[in-house]
Amino acid sequence: NYDGLFTHSTGRQAETMRIVHQVDNGRSLERLVSLDGSGREIVRTREEVHAYLPDRRVVIVEPRGDDGSLLKSLPTPGPALDRNYQLAVGPKGSRLLGREVRVIDVRPKDIYRYGYRLWLDEETAMPLQSVVTNGVGDPIEVIRFTQLQLKDTIPAHDIEPTVDATGFQWIRTGRKLAAMPQLPSKGGWRPGRLPPGFRLVASRLQPIPGSPMPAQHLIFSDGIAAISVFIEPG
């Protein structure tokens, strides 16, 4: 359980977010709030993810997939990771936010992937900072905690949305095609060639505004990086 502030930077754009994270009976609940600009909120419930967009007066609802917590996004050692990435663990002694951290570099072995540098809290393994790098090692995305409080309990109201959604349009999207991901049936679209290590990990139907027919949303991943493909009916 934790409550913190972090900055998310890409290029010349930066955003400050508050995150409140709770684990209840092994299931994570979460609320993200943008402290800049539109004030959007993302609430992860047990079954769904709700995105509140005040500037558009819209709430987007989609079924919850795998656990989207920070820990879930960490690379898992294994043959697939070893084939496509080189993992380097830094020495002890580094600190961030007054806490001991271990720096981990995840370096791609080809041109198809980005590199990653993670500052993991020694006690909890939480990433207190992460940097995505391009092929020459330049940072293209940075996520860094500026405040963090680890808590025994999180009040229920801290997970609830604060946006007044009265009069908002509710859009439900991302209906699953099947319980297990699978490629389109015979005669459908299939990838002709994927970068080494990538495989299909999710398959959903995505509504298209103004169209009665949904698009097919396929997600391919190598365990760290992910590629989305949208197929619209002709």
Label for each model-derived stretch:
Residues N1-V58, R83-T133:
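N-terminal mature ectodomain segment of secretory-pathway/periplasmic proteins
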Residues L53-S73:
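Acidic/charged, solvent-exposed loop-and-adjacent secondary-structure segments enriched in E/D, K/R, S/T
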Residues I60, P127-L128, I140, V201:
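Generic structural signal for well-ordered beta-strand positions
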Residues G65, R107, T133-N134, P207, ...:
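A generic structural motif
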Residues E100-I104, E141, P214-L218:
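Short beta-strand micro-motifs in enzyme catalytic cores
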Residues T133-Q149:
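Acidic, serine/threonine-rich low-complexity disordered tracts
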Residues R144, A156-L177:
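Pro/Ala/Gly-rich low-complexity, hydrophilic intrinsically disordered segments
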Residues F168-G234:
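Short, solvent-exposed recognition patches
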